[in-house]
């Protein structure tokens, strides 16, 4: 990496961190301690369905296929068990990308950050939402174990219009329980997480099939 690129990356990182800490002191975050023991009653994403049918069945961590747990971590956040809610290197790369593009298009969201967004925020991309997302993610990491964070995430993630959580997804796509998902099925569910509503209607294609095979190969 040349000197100019390093300097640009460092400047982008400093600007992002300065902006983040300036805003963070003014932002309130929801209480999350109760999530240690009590599943959420709903999520911000479920609430936006506005009266539409929602399929959601909570299942405990030990009733979710190990294949799915591994597939989702590999696909969405390979450093999940190492970081404290924010992948600093990924965030730095995203900040540089956004600075170059002069728009907020990449967010480097970890599983914990995605959980914060699903529970309390909206899918709209904005710097303001990203700051709240990071702050809530840091709070979740302080209050909950990694297994609990992953358990909640797998139970509230969206897998299609009105399809929330691993159990509903397993039944919707494969007519089976989440605990019985195989490697290929788990890789499919992990692969469609970035665009679940689109892939619910388009369940095959060259890109998706390559992504499924890549994730399956990691298991």
Which sequence ranges carry the predicted segments?
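Juxtamembrane regions of bacterial inner-membrane/periplasmic proteins
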Residues: 2-219
